[in-house]
Amino acid sequence: MKERTVLPIAVVGLSLLWIGTLGLWALDAQQADPVAVDGSKAVSTEQIKWKLVTTWPKGLPGLGSAPENFARRVEEMSNGRLSIRVYGAGEVVPPFEVFDAVSQGVAEMGHGASYYWKGKIPSSVFYTAVPFGMTAQEMNGWLHYGGGLELWRELYAPFGVRPFAGGSTGVQMAGWFNRELKSAEDLKGLKMRIPGLAGEVFTASGGTSVRLAGGEIYTSMQTGVIDAVEWVGPYNDRTLGLMEVAEYYYYPGWHEPGAMLEFTVNQEAFDRLPADLQAIVEGAARATNQDMLDEFTARNNSSLTSLLDEYETKLRPLPDDVMDILHSNAVIALDKLKEDDPMAAKISASYEDFLDGVRTYHEISERAYLNARDRVLPPISFTDQ
């Protein structure tokens, strides 16, 4: 009888061992790859907190509100799994150190303008604005469907930074001046806050370019440190009170026809995110990019009316010879940049090729329509001019 019980006991023992092993495997699998009730892959509930530093004063409409809107979108879309705290210029790092802060991991994200890093990355100017270059609509087309974004990421990759388009103001104003410009001669000796490639162009045209952050502009104009300033357009310029420190407001924005801002993300921090949160960051950036252009398009109108009617700002077009000398020097500056920097030559080839193509189509679409509209609608005039 005892011999008959050996096999069943052995079988039971092996079965229990096998069941226990399967249970451990299942537990390990569940811990490594959670599964929802319906059998789909469960979403991690880990809460991640990021810092986002900016080059703008806290609460500045348009530029400053864009990163706040981005952070809100990310938190809502991720159901609170990714929370981003936004810091204004100087709260964590000075405005012109935002790129380095993201590169070094001091903050996971930044928001600013790429031409602020011109001293470190000369080719970065292409991703804010090129004088007499693309509009916001054209820039977005080049970035997202013309290869521009891929080149941008190649440019920032050595610094461990991943860029996204972060909003556009549309065509800007040429700037505020404390004296009237009647000809190109009036540029001589003029000190102007104007960054990027346009700063080089302005200096070559007889003026002196000065690099200032947004929070320093008003006082610098008020105290005579500078004679002129370009910032954005009526919406933001009115907020900064620039109509109080300068009499003349010039157009068009030859230097920033479609100023593009940027979100920068520390690449290692981005790589650590689950795939769905990566997609949320990218999607929120894309939405914020378009939203800023919408906001400036809507708000500039009433702000310009206020500047003209309430503050009696003197609105002026730049004289033709001023535009001519600025364009001539812009060509020279761009050619020199391409000669000195192989990456600039590579990016410029893509940029110029896209611009040539889009200009051809816009000649019979955008421009043709605007001409047709002007022909049938009442003319627009400014009483001050």
Label every model-predicted segment.
Residues Q137-L155:
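A gly/proline- and charged-residue-enriched helix-loop-helix capping module
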Residues K2-M134, E138, A157, P163-Q385:
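N-terminal secretory/targeting leader peptides
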